[in-house]
UniProtKB/Swiss-Prot annotation:
Function text: The primary product of this enzyme is 4,2',4',6'-tetrahydroxychalcone (also termed naringenin-chalcone or chalcone) which can under specific conditions spontaneously isomerize into naringenin.
UniProt source species: Gerbera hybrida (Daisy)
Active site residues according to the UniProt entry: C170
GO molecular function: naringenin-chalcone synthase activity
Gene: CHS3
Protein name, per record: Chalcone synthase 3
Family annotation (InterPro entries): Chalcone/stilbene_synt_C, Chalcone/stilbene_synt_N, Chalcone/stilbene_synthase_AS, Polyketide_synthase_type-III, Thiolase-like
Pfam families: Chal_sti_synt_C, Chal_sti_synt_N
Similarity field: Belongs to the thiolase-like superfamily. Chalcone/stilbene synthases family.
Length: 403
C-alpha cells in the first residue's frame, strides 16, 4: 500500500528560506571620475566658468565657504569643456534638465560599474552568484533605471532581483544597508550587490545673491560611487567578512520639516538647506544612539567606532561636541570629507572602506579600529536619520585592502 507523502507546512518552508546568521559586509569597492578639483582653486574656477566674476562680494563669500569646508579636493564628472558645450547649466535658473539628464542617465551606472567591479573582485565569487541588486542615486530618474543599466553593464544574470532608489539624498547610504540586511537575512544564500553612485551634474549651477544655500552645495558636493556585497552565513573558504550588521533603524527628526530638501525642475535639482541643520542633528543624535545600543548595554559613545555621514564640517563638529567624542572618533569621516567632499549616499560606504583599510594598516585587531561595536549614521532630507549598528570582525589583509 502506497504511503502518502509527508505534508510540508508553510512554517517549514519559511524557515528553510531564511539565513541563519546576520547580514555581513563581504567586500567594498569605490570609484570616482578622473577629473580632480582642488578646493583652493575652486572659487576662481567656479566664478570663471559660470561667467560670474563681476559678483565680487559673492565670490568672497564663496571663498570663505570653501576655506571653512575642510575639503581639500573633490572629483567631478563635469569639466570646463562640457560646461562650454552646455552653457545653460552655468546659469542660476536656466532650463537645463535635458542636458543634465542626457549626461547622468549614462554616467551614473558607468561610475557604479567601476565601484561594483572592484567589490566583486575582492569578494572572490563569480558575479553569477549575485542574487539581488540595490542601486541608489540622487540623479537621473529614468525607465528602465540605473539598476537595469548596471545589470547589463556588469553582465549580471537577467533573473537578478533589482531594487532602484532615486532621489533619497544623503541619508540613503544607511538605507541601502538596511534594505540589504533584510534581503540577506530573509533569503538563504542571497548575495546582495549594493551600489550608490552620485554625480553632481544635476545640482551644478551658477551663483545667486538670494540663494546662499545653493552656494553652500556648490562648495561641498562631489562625485563618487561605492559598492558593497552583503550576505549571511559567509563561505570562509572564499569570502572575507568585514562587518556584521546587528540592527538598522530610520527616523524623522522632530521639528525638522524643510531643513533639507531638493526639487527636480526644468532647471535641474534645486537644493535648499537651513542653517540649523547641524544643531537639529546634534540635538537628536543621542536619542538614536540610546535606542540602538541599549540592547547591548552600551552607553559610552567613545567606546564604539564611528561612521557618520559628513554632510559638512559643522555637523561633525556639533555631534562631536554634543556627545563629548574624542577627536579621533570622527577621523575616518573627516578624512573622506577632506579627500572627496560630500558624495551624498556614497559617503558612508567610502568611510567604511577607509576604516577597514586604516585598521589593517595600523595593525588593529578588528576592522573597526580595534573596537568591537560601532555605529553608521546617515543624515539627509526630512530630516531623516538612518542608524546602523555594526559589529567589527578580525582584521585580515587581502589584495583589495592593499590597493
Amino acid at each position: 500500500m502506497a504511503t502518502s507523502p509527508a505534508v510540508i507546512d508553510v512554517e517549514t518552508i519559511r524557515k528553510a528560506q531564511r539565513a541563519e546568521g546576520p547580514a555581513t559586509i563581504l567586500a567594498i569597492g569605490t570609484a570616482t571620475p578622473a577629473n580632480c578639483v582642488y578646493q583652493a582653486d575652486y572659487p576662481d574656477y567656479y566664478f570663471r566658468v559660470t561667467e560670474s566674476e563681476h559678483m565680487v562680494d559673492l565670490k568672497e563669500k564663496f571663498q570663505r565657504m570653501c576655506d571653512k569646508s575642510m575639503i581639500r579636493k573633490r572629483y567631478m564628472h563635469i569639466t570646463e569643456e562640457f560646461l562650454k558645450e552646455n552653457p545653460s547649466m552655468c546659469k542660476f535658473m536656466a532650463p537645463s534638465l535635458d542636458a543634465r539628464q542626457d549626461l547622468v542617465v549614462v554616467e551614473v551606472p558607468k561610475l557604479g560599474k567601476e565601484a561594483a567591479t572592484k567589490a566583486i573582485k575582492e569578494w572572490g565569487f563569480p558575479k553569477s552568484k549575485i542574487t539581488h541588486l540595490v542601486f541608489c542615486t540622487t540623479s537621473g530618474v529614468d525607465m528602465p533605471g540605473a539598476d537595469y543599466q548596471l545589470t547589463k553593464l556588469l553582465g549580471l544574470r537577467p533573473s537578478v532581483k533589482r531594487l532602484m532608489m532615486y532621489q533619497q539624498g544623503c541619508f540613503a547610504g544607511g538605507t541601502v544597508l538596511r534594505l540589504a540586511k533584510d534581503l540577506a537575512e530573509n533569503n538563504k544564500g542571497a548575495r546582495v550587490l549594493v551600489v550608490c553612485s552620485e554625480i553632481t551634474a544635476v545640482t551644478f549651477r551658477g551663483p545667486n545673491e538670494g540663494h546662499l544655500d545653493s552656494l553652500v552645495g556648490q562648495a561641498l558636493f562631489g562625485d563618487g560611487a561605492a559598492a558593497v556585497i552583503i550576505g549571511s552565513d559567509p563561505d570562509l573558504s572564499v569570502e572575507r567578512p568585514l562587518f556584521e550588521m546587528v540592527s538598522a533603524a530610520q527616523t524623522i527628526l522632530p521639528d525638522s520639516e524643510g531643513a533639507i530638501d531638493g526639487h527636480l525642475k526644468e532647471v535641474g535639482l534645486t537644493f535648499h538647506l537651513l542653517k540649523d541643520v547641524p544643531a537639529l542633528i546634534a540635538k537628536n543624535i543621542e536619542k538614536a544612539l540610546i535606542q540602538a545600543f541599549s540592547p547591548l548595554n552600551i552607553n559610552d559613545w567613545n567606546s564604539i567606532f564611528w561612521i557618520a555621514h559628513p554632510g559638512g564640517p559643522a555637523i561633525l563638529d556639533q555631534v562631536e561636541f554634543k556627545l563629548g567624542l574624542r577627536e579621533e572618533k570622527l577621523r575616518a569621516s573627516r578624512h573622506v570629507l577632506s579627500e572627496y567632499g560630500n558624495m551624498s549616499s556614497a559617503c558612508v560606504l567610502f568611510i567604511l572602506d577607509e576604516m577597514r583599510k586604516k585598521s589593517i594598516k595600523d595593525g588593529k585587531t578588528t576592522t573597526g579600529e580595534g573596537l568591537e561595536w560601532g555605529v553608521l549614521f546617515g543624515f539627509g532630507p526630512g530630516l531623516t536619520v538612518e542608524t546602523v549598528v555594526l559589529h567589527s570582525l578580525p582584521a585580515t589583509i587581502s589584495v583589495a585592502t592593499q590597493n
